[in-house]
């Protein structure tokens, strides 16, 4: 749980970190701030440096402390409250870096899950293995239901305390220390980074540049990709994206061309297509802002289909959106899940209904994984964050108001043109 006393314009609000976080509302209220804040908690569990800095700040040097370890005992004790306070401060530093804004003001309070003890004890045990006179001495560390064996004399850049702490947190929060392998960010205006030499000024685009560098150079893992997701991406792209000699290429039935010559929509979606082909998306966390960017309304709905496949695959996601088309479709897919549950004893009936609706029955989205938050402006100009009842769907009140205003103004203009009155 994160309590926000202040974060930019956001004040006196609370959010609970969930597998999928969806933020909507008018522009300028802080959706990106919240998405980055939520992504931070996945990023820090994968980053080998940040928690290591916390361990170093406490003066816990494993190499020095090792000399005093005998048989078994307690190595260190981490105060949960102290670590939560450190997380709150480090999160603000992270956001300042991501936004290139050292003046960003923030005050947070963070609470880790209740099943993590208030005092996190790290125990050690000496272990001697091997033949007589050729023994190898190891230290085994125990913390948060995990064990880590370190051979005497081994040197790692990350403290064994930090390494075990990170993976213990993953185990306790996500259910298995193997459930998070990497994190990726996809900011707004993603396309130009694929084709242009851009020097990022913000941490957000610096991380995105590293994201596309990484996924552009790893080998494909087709065995981890569902055919359903592959077909959806091919349909929305109307082709296929690949890399060759460090260049991004777009191929269709009419031939192959540099991605720089493809439509803006293709360049925006291309990194997602590569991510799907080259990572195990069930074990990654992904921040994606404005997935609907540069897409026709029909393709905005298709993007909701694609992200529903990510959700069902187990991807941890933080999403911001301005699109009522995207949200409407997501609501449809959540209702489709409810329909599938109604006919859980009669799957043939469910499939028949889907066929009549001309919708893929596999697209129903696991709505219980989603937490949706609506950002709105208070009378004093600050931003309020309100959790939505996902059982009723994701609301799009701000979009409805814009549509009503547009219809009303359009009607009055036409009326004035017709008879000179309003």
Model feature map: region roles:
Residues 300-312:
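Helical segment within the ABC ATPase nucleotide-binding domain
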Residues 185-186, 364-376:
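Extended hydrophobic secondary-structure segments that form protein cores and membrane-embedded regions
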Residues 1-199, 328, 334-363, 383-389, ...:
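P-loop NTPase switch/coupling surface
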Residues 205-208, 212-246, 251:
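ABC-family P-loop ATPase nucleotide-binding domains
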Residues 316-325:
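Conserved H-loop
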Residues 25-28, 32-33, 242-301:
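Conserved ABC ATPase signature
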Residues 38-45, 275-278, 306-309:
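Walker A/P-loop NTP-binding motif
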């Amino acid at each position: 749980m994160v309590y926000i006393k202040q974060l930019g314009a956001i004040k006196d609000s609370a959010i609970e970190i969930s597998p999928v976080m969806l933020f909507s509302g008018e522009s300028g209220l802080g959706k990106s701030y919240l998405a980055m804040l939520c992504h931070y908690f996945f990023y820090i569990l994968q980053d080998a440096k940040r928690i290591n800095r916390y361990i170093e700040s406490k003066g816990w040097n494993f190499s020095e402390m090792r000399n005093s370890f005998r048989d078994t005992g307690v190595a260190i004790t981490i105060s949960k409250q102290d670590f939560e306070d450190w997380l709150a401060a480090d999160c603000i530093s992270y956001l300042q870096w991501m936004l290139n804004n050292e003046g960003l003001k923030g005050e947070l309070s963070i609470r880790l899950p209740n099943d993590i003890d208030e005092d996190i004890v790290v125990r050690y045990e000496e272990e001697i293995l091997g033949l007589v006179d050729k023994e190898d001495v190891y230290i085994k560390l125990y913390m948060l239901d995990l064990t880590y064996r370190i051979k005497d004399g081994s040197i790692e850049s990350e403290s064994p305390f930090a390494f075990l702490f990170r993976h213990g947190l993953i185990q306790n929060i996500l259910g298995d220390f193997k459930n998070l392998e990497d994190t990726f960010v996809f900011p707004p205006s993603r396309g130009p980074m694929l084709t242009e030499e851009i020097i990022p000024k913000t941490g957000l685009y610096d991380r995105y540049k590293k994201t596309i560098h990484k996924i552009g150079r790893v080998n494909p893992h087709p065995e981890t990709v569902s055919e359903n997701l592959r077909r959806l991406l091919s349909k929305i792209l109307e082709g296929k994206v690949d890399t060759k000699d460090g260049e991004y290429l777009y191929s269709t039935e009419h031939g192959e061309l540099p991605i720089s010559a493809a439509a803006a929509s293709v360049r925006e979606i291309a990194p997602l297509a590569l991510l799907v082909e080259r990572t195990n998306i069930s074990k990654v966390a992904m921040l994606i802002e404005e997935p609907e960017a540069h897409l026709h309304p029909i393709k905005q709905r298709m993007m909701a289909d694609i992200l529903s496949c990510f959700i069902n695959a187990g991807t941890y996601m933080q999403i911001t959106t301005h699109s009522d088309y995207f949200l409407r479709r997501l609501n449809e897919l959540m209702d489709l899940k409810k329909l599938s549950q109604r006919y859980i004893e009669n799957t043939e009936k469910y499939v028949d209904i889907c066929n009549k609706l001309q919708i893929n029955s596999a697209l129903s989205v696991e709505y219980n994984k989603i937490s949706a938050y609506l950002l709105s402006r208070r009378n004093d100009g600050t931003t309020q964050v309100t959790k939505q009842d996902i059982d009723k769907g994701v609301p799009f009140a701000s979009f409805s108001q814009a549509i009503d205003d547009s219809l009303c103004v359009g009607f009055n203009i036409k009326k004035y043109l017709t008879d000179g009155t309003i």
